[in-house]
Amino acid sequence: YGSSPRQNATTGWTLRDTEGNILQSGQWNSKEIPVGNNFTLGEVAAPLTTVTTPQRLILEVSVNNRKNDWNIWVYPTVRQAIPHENKICMTDRLDTITLNTLEKGATVLLSLKKGSLSKELGGDIQIGFSSIFWNTAWTAKQAPHTLGILCNPAHPALSEFPTEYHSDYQWWDAMSHSGAIEFSKLSPKIHPIVRVIDDWFTNRPLALLFEARVGKGKILVSGIDFWQDMDKRPEARQLLYSLKKYMNSPAFHPDTELKREQIQQLL
């Protein structure tokens, strides 16, 4: 968008980790860069075989002394097995068998299928990866109704899913397959692992992930649908792995106690 094309521009790229270590880099042949959009500088090809842990990488592109960068997330295709993973009961329903097993001491991961959350607990709230336009009061409750997420990046449930305290593009998939749970109607003592930020006009306490004790058992409730098209959702697979690893650890020790009847209100 300058006054004329750039002649013989020096262009290149680097791929680095969050510590500043350069994993790969390259340069493109000098060329004329036209004014405007929709032209190609070159291709980026970077083997990722050296990346063995889930992490955020930064792709930086330079044109002469000007730079821009983008976050990308890399997850291993082969993960360390979770001991006794089969002891985690993963379900999308709360039938009598599941509830009885939970009360007797089972560990349950309740992943709500998108659209199954009861209206009373947030089923009519439409999450969007992008924020609302202006506010819902001025747009007749036009979707989306929320403003991203808030979480503690150091929470052990997210140890295998690198994140900052706010949403970035690794959360796009989860937020596109989820519902916002109005957890205060279950218990004001719940402290969500991942909180959904509501529109300031309604300001409801909303959760994407939370945990609780029910009887002698422990439950992690996910507003994220971990059922649909999982073969096409690498971010969802990685987040699910992180949650299961947490649930199989001593760190999974919910403080909030809920009754059977309270949990049943979710569906």
Region spans (language model):
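Short alpha-beta junction capping motif
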Residues: 85-135, 213-216, 220-222, 243
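Solvent-exposed, conformationally flexible loop/turn segments
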Residues: 33-39
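Beta-strand-rich binding/interaction modules
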Residues: 1-30, 41-44, 54-63
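Short amphipathic C-terminal alpha-helix that caps PH/PH-like domains
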Residues: 235-247
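Residues that act as N-cap/strand-start positions at coil-to-secondary-structure junctions
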Residues: 66, 94, 204-206
